[in-house]
Amino acid sequence: MSIKIENLNHIYMPKTPFEKIALNNINCEIEDGEFVALIGHTGSGKSTFIQHLNGLLSPTSGNIIVDGVNIADKKVKLSDIRKKVGLVFQYPEYQLFEETIEKDIEYGPRNLGISEEEISKRVKKSMEMVGLDYETYKDKSPFDLSGGQKRRVAIAGVIAMEPKVLILDEPTAGLDPKGREDILAQIRLLHKEYGMTIIMVSHSMEDVAKIADRVIVMNSGEIVLDGKIAEVFKEVETLEKIGLAVPQVTYLIRELRNKGFNISEEIFTISQAKEALLEIIRNNN
C-alpha cells in the first residue's frame, strides 16, 4: 500500500495576521514495506505532515493518495483510511486510561464492531508484536509499568487496529537508554518480521541510522533532502546549515579519513565503526 503526496500545502490561520505556512509544496511517495525516517528541527513541519497522512489534518491544497484513494476529497470516509494508517503520537502513554492492559489495547478494535473472538485474537497478537507476553501482562494496570513498557502498550493499541502503515512521532522521546533500545528493537521487528510500512519522526540521527532505510529531511515546511541513509548523511554541510547533524560517529570517521586512514565514509553507527576499525587493526597486524 503506497502513500503519494502531490503538491501538498498547509496554512495555519490563513488570511489573518497570524497566517503561517506549515507545509509548502510537498511531493513524495512512500512505497509499500518501506521504513522511512522523517527528520528536521522543531517547527520544520514534520508533525503537521504526518497528521495529513491519515486525515487528522486537511490540506489547504494538494493531494494525499492513500492506497489509490485521494483522502483530500471531502467525500472520502476517513475512518476507513485510519484503519489502514495508524498514528502513534509523541508520549502516547499519556493516552492510556483503562484498568488493565488488555482493556486498553482492545478499546480501538471494540469500536470496529468486530466479534469478541476477533478482538481477543488482535489483542494477543499485538501484545506479542511489541514483546509483551499476554498471560503475564493482560491483567496488569498500565500505570504500574515502566515508561518503555507503557509506550509498548500504547503502540500495541494502534497495532490492534491492524494498520498497513504505522506512523510514529518521536517514539523514543523521554525514555532512558534501555527503554530507547527496547522500543527501537520492537519497531525494527514490526518492519522486518511483520512487513509493516513504518514512518518514524525522530530528532536522533543515531536512531535513524540504526533502523531506517530512507530519510526525508524537512526544513521550513519543505523537503530539503530525500534518499537512502548513505545519500542523505553524506550531505553534512546541507544538514548543518539547517541546524541538524550527522551521527557523532560519522564525524569521527571523517576525521580518520582526513588523517589518511583507509576507511569507508558510509559509516553511521557505532557497530559499523567498530567493524571498520577492527578491520584496520587486523590488516595492520
Swiss-Prot record:
User: What's its EC?
Assistant: 7.-.-.-
> Mind giving the lineage of the organism this protein is from?
Bacteria, Bacillati, Bacillota, Clostridia, Eubacteriales
Tell me which UniProt keywords the record has, alphabetically. Answer: ATP-binding, Cell membrane, Membrane, Nucleotide-binding, Translocase, Transport
Species of the source: Clostridium perfringens (strain 13 / Type A)
Described function: ATP-binding (A) component of a common energy-coupling factor (ECF) ABC-transporter complex. Unlike classic ABC transporters this ECF transporter provides the energy necessary to transport a number of different substrates.
Matching entries from NCBIfam families are given as: ECF_ATPase_2 (TIGR04521), PRK13637.1 (NF010158)
Q: What is its main location?
A: membrane
Q: Could you tell me which residue ranges the ABC transporter domain spans?
A: 3-245
Where is the secretion signal located? Answer: none
Subcellular compartments: Cell membrane
Q: Does the keyword Translocase apply?
A: yes
Q: How does it assemble?
A: Forms a stable energy-coupling factor (ECF) transporter complex composed of 2 membrane-embedded substrate-binding proteins (S component), 2 ATP-binding proteins (A component) and 2 transmembrane proteins (T component).
Can you cite an annotated GO cellular component? ATP-binding cassette (ABC) transporter complex
Q: How does it sit in the membrane?
A: Peripheral membrane protein
Membrane recorded as keyword: yes
Q: What is the name of this protein?
A: Energy-coupling factor transporter ATP-binding protein EcfA2
